[in-house]
């Protein structure tokens, strides 16, 4: 037993130094680790709770990638671009503001070029017109009115040139530069001062039982109205009541003029219709017909009284008889009427007979200045004695309000049957349409009227050509004619309500009235239709200083040979 114990003891003794050495190493390592943990804990106590630098250091250690420079740029550059795009408004950086002048330069250049060409054309036109004025004044002693008119046309043309040059530089409705309007007080086409205070008149105070039977046979309605006005003068001189002819012998005057209004204007009965005369004539009650005691002819040539057998037959059909032969107090030719005085008329046509007739006095030339003055030679309280009846006047006013307005030019463009009539005169008054259009355009330019009313008997082919040639400043000036009857239009309602529609004489008087109310009137030389319009304009106070005959002071640039 003792032997076994000895061997164990011996083994333990031999291993003891090595074990001590290992134990010592373990103790040192343990102490070292304990010291490290202690130091680490002390440092942790000294650091803030969220140490960013420590976190970044640990992240770098955790996520450290072995990337090259190119790889880094490839990865991070798109991210940077996306972030910048989301956080920045690029609209202000990429929108380019180009000045308006850059876009307008081409347009403005074109407008300037166009206006320069227009101004050059107008300057050449002005030069031509000035030469024409110069040549005209050298060869003729022009009146001051002609010179004023010509000068104004050039001023108007000069104004157009100014506007043409300034037009590219205008914006909106701004007017650049001055105006010459201030130099023309009252405008370029002022109303004519009729000086009514200086009228020379005669009192018409007829004897109630003495009558003058009007005989008007020459020409159309306008001739008859002028003839009727002269008959009024004769009736006033002879102190007689004037009998208006029957529509069965003459025109239907009661549809065109207001006969009762004439009596109102004078404050007494001075005119009666044929029907009224028939009722009150004392001879008719005895003999059952109207008797003309004396028939006096103003003209003896080419035939007495300008009355033929046909008219005598018509008078008899009315129940009118003529006593004795046609009487002629003097030698007077229609082709060459002489000037007569009021005293001569009174001396040669005075009679004690109850009913006398004088015919035809349309061509009579008695106290012309007296007869032609505004309002006529008879004293009255109206503007004129013979004027359209109230229905026609109102219809004309409604037409003007509907289609024309206040400022318009009226043109009486006589064509039918006028070519032969005018070419028999020297100079001729029948103008080619292009020449007529040129004359009309000049007046439109002067008046500055936006529209032209056309009273004409011309064919559509002629009026169509005229319309196409009426161009001012590149714009067509509209021609307005009375349209055909349309139930949708109400301006002419008064006429058809009173049964006057479709009457050619009513329509002619309506045309006259519209022309008489215009701002400026262009008439046809030699036409009594025009002369009656001028009479109305003079009496109504609508006459303008610019009123004229078509192409006045000009001759047709082409005249056909005679047959």
UniProtKB/Swiss-Prot annotation:
Its EC number is 2.4.1.-. Residues 1-16 have a biased composition (Low complexity). Belongs to the glycosyltransferase GT106 family. This is O-fucosyltransferase 14. One of its GO terms (cellular component) is membrane. It is a single-pass type II membrane protein. One of its GO terms (molecular function) is peptide-O-fucosyltransferase activity. GO terms for biological process: fucose metabolic process. It comes from Arabidopsis thaliana. The chain crosses the membrane at residues 73-93. Glycans are attached at residues 135, 140, 339.
